[in-house]
Amino acid sequence: MYKRQAADGKPTATNVWLWGMGQRPDLTAFADLHGVQGAMITAVDLLRGLAALVGWDRIEVPGATGYTDTDYAAKGRYAIEALDKYDLVCVHIEAPDESSHEGDLKKKIASLESIDMDIVAPILAHLEKTGEPYRLLVTPDHPTYLSTKTHTHGDVPFTICGSGIDADSYDQYHEANAAASELAMPNGWDLMPFFISKDSVSYTHLTLPTIYSV
């Protein structure tokens, strides 16, 4: 390629930047670990790779870009359709993270509103309409602050609703309410068993320390 570029009078590469090297981790299949069949909806290669490592199917959604112009409604529709086949569907949206990297408050607010209206609300309405037991979890995977425009470590809020979940006194989902919750999870890997457990849960706004920054 270098020789072709040079022969055509085009700019040539002068350095090779090797990034993200490492060995393929050996992870236990999600179904073997939890007895649940899962699928992933995402436009981000990292999440596609994680899905493959835990044995989740990857659902491709037309219009999913991994940016703020992603088709939120399409992700919501495809997730609803996938629930007929899978026990658990993970819908990943990169837009708020990208907005924080750009330091763009308006974009971040708009992306969160789109997630709420076009993904969370339709999925919740569908789950309630079925009349079958369900649970719905909303959470970020790590903090990305507008002020720093970069990933960081720290607690992240999550909220759960559905069968066996007793609502607490909070009616808004944000960091302050999560921090005031009586329940925290020092070990992030405890979240999934907590989420899919058949036992009742009496708190819906909790604090979960991030496991890693991506």
Pin down the residues of each PLM region:
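Conserved small/polar residues in nucleotide/adenosyl-binding loops
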Residues: 1-2, 204-210
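Loop-centered beta-sheet repeat module
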Residues: 3-31
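Flexible, glycine/charged-enriched surface loops at secondary-structure junctions
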Residues: 4-15, 61, 89-90, 129-135
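Anion-binding catalytic surfaces of enzymes that hydrolyze or transfer phosphate/sulfate esters
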Residues: 23-109
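Active-site proximal loops enriched in glycine and acidic residues that flank catalytic Cys/His/Asp
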Residues: 62-63, 92-95, 104, 116, ...
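Metal-dependent active-site segment of extracytoplasmic phospho-/sulfohydrolases and closely related
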Residues: 111-154
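Internal helix-turn-beta structural module
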Residues: 139-196
